[in-house]
Amino acid sequence: MPEDRPIEDSPPIGEAQTDAPAGGCPAGFGRIKPPVAGGSNRDWWPNQLNLKILQKNPDVINPLDEDFDYRSAVQNLDVDALRADIVEVMHTSQDWWPADFGHYGPLFIRMAWHAAGTYRVSDGRGGAGAGMQRFAPLNSWPDNASLDKARRLLWPVKKKYGKNLSWADLIVYAGNVALEDMGFRTAGFAFGREDRWEPEEDVYWGPEQEWLDDKRYTGERDLENPLAAVQMGLIYVNPEGPNGNPDPQASAIDIRETFGRMAMNDVETAALIVGGHTFGKTHGNGDASLVGPEPEAAPLEEVGLGWRNPQGTGVGKDAITSGLEVTWTHTPTKWDNSFLEILYGNEWELTKSPAGANQWKPKDNGWANSVPLAHEDGKTHPSMLTSDLALRVDPIYEQITRRWLDHPEELAEEFAKAWFKLLHRDMGPVTRYLGPEVPKDTWLWQDNIPAGNDLSDDEVAKLKELIADSGLTVSQLVSTAWKAASTFRSSDLRGGANGGRIRLQPQLGWEANEPDELAQVVRKYEEIQKASGINVSFADLVVLGGNVGVEKAAKAAGFDVTVPFTPGRGDATQEETDVDSFAYLEPKADGFRNYLGKGSDLPAEFKLIDRANLLGLSAPEMTTLVGGLRVLDVNHGGTKHGVLTDKPGALTTDFFVNLLDMSTAWKPSPADDGTYIGTDRATGSPKWTGTRVDLVFASNSQLRALAEVYAEDDSKEKFVKDFVAAWTKVMDADRFDVA
């Protein structure tokens, strides 16, 4: 993170800096309308549901061959040769962007840090796992200024290894190699991140419309969820201090909040700051207001680069990235303990960078002429950021870092672990880690699951019979499997039924999981598990039970189906489960079961789309699951909202048929609780009740089109088939151990 303050006075997001006259439109500049007729639907109806997020990364935009499998290809990578090529790049300074101190390592560390550091634990979004730093908005965030050059420096490496090395892997591996080349011993590295080919449109980065604006706080300093940065376009905190106020203690509050929101504790936070700021420098040797537009707003001739600096050479000693001009240590390309030695070896006074940014220098000319200049002979004094001094003034951070001052080996160990966590937090379980540098050590945050057992066809058949005869209802079987599997997040590949954590805390006590009823079902499954004499995991039993429920429901609707089942799930223990970390997976809403928790900040139908998105579902898959789960009577609390059938427990198309029936008139409930009453249009007698999630399948034009398909007379068998396919997709979403 050696460069983490954005350029001030940036234009509004998406708007280029230009001298175009009012009303004029010089070619390639200004705010021009794309070649489409009129505004988009979103312009006309800004509150419209965005179903496009349910069709992310379609195959049609992927230029690679249909049968190409990156996770297989990357295992053929010559990692030693790749490492050597990255090292050569780091030591070969280019005139178009000269290396600070003759080494691009610190720049690559910052690139990797800022790629991974967008991760946030609340919804699992962000992170380095898909190479999103290449695309807007991240490629143009003020905090990512000059990282366009870092990626461009690595293009010859990417070009050489082609499709066998993703940008997502290369960006973070280059940072890892940089640390090791400068003398640090990392904990290892895992390959396996697959590139995507379009920006992520489903990530909420904040309400602001201008870079560095701050409209995300309420109260004294309450940061809006799920955000994990203090201003639009920053990765974490403003290194000058909150909103530029150079108050180290206030900065410590922001640091703890933002790093905590990306799953780092105090020790990990301190280690990342100290370790990252052991290397390199920041850039602010000039007037930051003169720097050109970011890559997405830059003219075509910049060929994807941005932030052109017209002052002096514009690069090297004249470079401007953050507006801060700080070199922390006298050995900026070597791992040592000098950052802490300098931080605690001086008293500090506030000063200004050449760009006018708040930073700190030693009092009384301390450590004068001890820090090298990056691009010319001579030396200067060290400098610090407000966020650096926070480590010294905050009592908790001070206790941690003062110990490291005397025990640098402990700092090295903690930084290695925290850096590995930073780069791999969004990769999912260790079964997804690939390559020769995967560490043997495992950590609690990886949500580790012991290997499960295979089951024979006869064993599966016996277990299904025991479940069917257990007295558990279709609703109990299906809802329990859904509660377990639907915790899965495609964003960071956490959650899911594997591990059997539905029987453990915190999931066993979640309000959304109806703890009293869930405890009864868990006990029944444990009885079956013991009585069967079969070495079956609790996790497998829950999914198999859900399948039994679906098969029963299909038979009640007149169809004999066998729901696909792949055994092999393992059972985690309570000791292998980080209760605090898993708490972030607790559903605040689950439209599939008509559950809406207290204090929801969005209408229920928007929450449904978000949950379907995290589950990796398409709009048709979401539609079939909602319609099917309604008639299977699995609503939270046993409510009858949306159970539009007189045959609950049968997998029929009744939800769609009755929802679209024009003999029913709907109106809001007098209770004003977000529910609706459906009455007979002729007699006025009540027929049904529903929620916003139910009625949206008749109200939204796209969802209605899907609902109509399943309401048609010839769709009964198709619906059962489609429901089973979507159900199986959710049940197996976390099965990274099988093809």
Swiss-Prot record:
E.C. number: 1.11.1.21
Keywords, sorted A to Z: Heme, Hydrogen peroxide, Iron, Metal-binding, Oxidoreductase, Peroxidase
Enzyme kind, highest EC tier: oxidoreductase
Covalent link (Tryptophyl-tyrosyl-methioninium (Trp-Tyr) (with M-262)) residue numbers: W113-Y236
Catalytic activity entry: H2O2 + AH2 = A + 2 H2O; 2 H2O2 = O2 + 2 H2O
TM spans (from-to): none
MF GO annotations: catalase activity; heme binding; metal ion binding
Self-association and partners: Homodimer or homotetramer.
Family named by the database record: Belongs to the peroxidase family. Peroxidase/catalase subfamily.
Function recorded in the entry: Bifunctional enzyme with both catalase and broad-spectrum peroxidase activity. May play a role in the intracellular survival of mycobacteria.
Protein name per the record: Catalase-peroxidase 1
Species the sequence originates in: Mycolicibacterium smegmatis (strain ATCC 700084 / mc(2)155) (Mycobacterium smegmatis)
Lineage: Bacteria, Bacillati, Actinomycetota, Actinomycetes, Mycobacteriales
